C-alpha cells in the first residue's frame, strides 16, 4: 500500500477529532511512512534535552509532536472551510497536470 498523505507541508488544516478538535494550524512536517503530520500549535509536548553543543545547559524544551494524518482536514484557501480533496487534470501546454481541488467550492488548491 502506498504511503500517501492527503496534505502537504505548508497547508492550513483543522483538527477534526481528539484533544485538539477544532484547532487550526499550518502543517510543518509530513511523515508519509508513519502516516502522521506535525501541525503548528497542536500536540505540544515537553522534551528533556541533555547538554550538547547546541544547548550547553540542556533542559526542558516544548515542541510539536506528530498526530495521525486522518485526524486533520484541509482548509480551503478560498471558501475558508474544512473540505475533502478532489483531483482534477488541467492542460498545461502539451501535458496534463494533476491538481488538488476543493470538494465544496470546486476551486483549485495548488
Swiss-Prot record:
GO biological process: translation
Alphabetical list of CDD domains matching this protein: KOW_RPL26
Record-level Gene Ontology MF annotations: rRNA binding; structural constituent of ribosome
Keyword terms of this UniProt record: Ribonucleoprotein, Ribosomal protein, RNA-binding, rRNA-binding
A cellular component term, taken from the record's GO annotations: ribosome
Superkingdom classification of source: Bacteria
Annotated Pfam families: KOW, ribosomal_L24
Protein family according to the UniProt entry: Belongs to the universal ribosomal protein uL24 family.
Protein name: Large ribosomal subunit protein uL24
Protein's organism: Caldicellulosiruptor saccharolyticus (strain ATCC 43494 / DSM 8903 / Tp8T 6331)
Amino acid at each position: 500500500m502506498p504511503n500517501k498523505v492527503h496534505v502537504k507541508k505548508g497547508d492550513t488544516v483543522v483538527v477534526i477529532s481528539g484533544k485538539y478538535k477544532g484547532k487550526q494550524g499550518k502543517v510543518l512536517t509530513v511523515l508519509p511512512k508513519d502516516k502522521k503530520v506535525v501541525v503548528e500549535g497542536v500536540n505540544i509536548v515537553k522534551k528533556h534535552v541533555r547538554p550538547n553543543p547546541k544547548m550547553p545547559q540542556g533542559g526542558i524544551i516544548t515542541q510539536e509532536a506528530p498526530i495521525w494524518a486522518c485526524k486533520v482536514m484541509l482548509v480551503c484557501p478560498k471558501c475558508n472551510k474544512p473540505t475533502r480533496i478532489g483531483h482534477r487534470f488541467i492542460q498545461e501546454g502539451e501535458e496534463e497536470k494533476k491538481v488538488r481541488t476543493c470538494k465544496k467550492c470546486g476551486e483549485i488548491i495548488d
